[in-house]
Each structure stands twice: as structure tokens, then as C-alpha cells.
Amino acid sequence: MSHKRESGRQVTENLRTGPVPRTKLILCVEDNKAYLRLRKTVLEREGYSVLTATTGAEALKVFREEPVSLVLSDHMLRGTTGVALAHQLKTIKPHVPFVLYSGTVPDIMGDADCFISKDETVASFLSIIKSLIKRHGE
């Protein structure tokens, strides 16, 4: 299956968004616990339900067991990368959007649907998440 990779800005420029139902479940994967709490808080304030994982193995377990609408993952994780995790998760549920984020742009995005810089504004970050969820009809 071929996926078109887009930057966060391209996603929001290519898709008008309206309100997203407030029951969407996002899996946030980050090994930095302070950053994980920050992302979780921002998403929950927007009405999303958020599950968290600090390792690729933990994310894989949650992804298999829960009806996740979108995965948001750091690129550099202990023991794996976001690119490797995207490949594993897309093998299980290819329709679930996978957003890779990092402080630096990775050379390879693999199966990730979109890349977001950690420097992205909160408003832009949330707009990208909303756009991807709406686009994938979840």
C-alpha cells in the first residue's frame, strides 16, 4: 500500500477541518516522561482520550488491544525508532494514521503518514492531528 507522506503544514493546507468528535483515542509514544505528560495534557484539553506508552513494545501492546484513532510517536525511542514502530503498527492496522515527531527531520519516514517538528506551535500541532483523524474517517 502506498502512502503519500506530508509535512504537518501540507496536511492542514490540503484539508479543511471542522470539529472532531471528542471521543477519539490517540496513542502517544514518548520515552521522555515530561514531554509525554505535556502532549497528553494538550490533547486531553482538546477533548481527545489519550493512552500513553514509553517503549515500542508497550505501544504495540496498547495498539493491539485498544481502538486507537491515531498514533503520535517520537522518532527516537529507547530500543527502537518511530519509523520501525510505524512499520509494525501499519502491518496490524494500516488505516490508522501514524504521526512521527522529532526535533530533527528524519532521513526516512518509512510508513509514517506525517512528520511534525517538536518546534511546531500548539495550534498547528492540534490542527494537524484533527486533519489526519478527519481524513481517515475515524
Predicted features and spans:
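Active-site residues of response regulator receiver
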Residues: 74
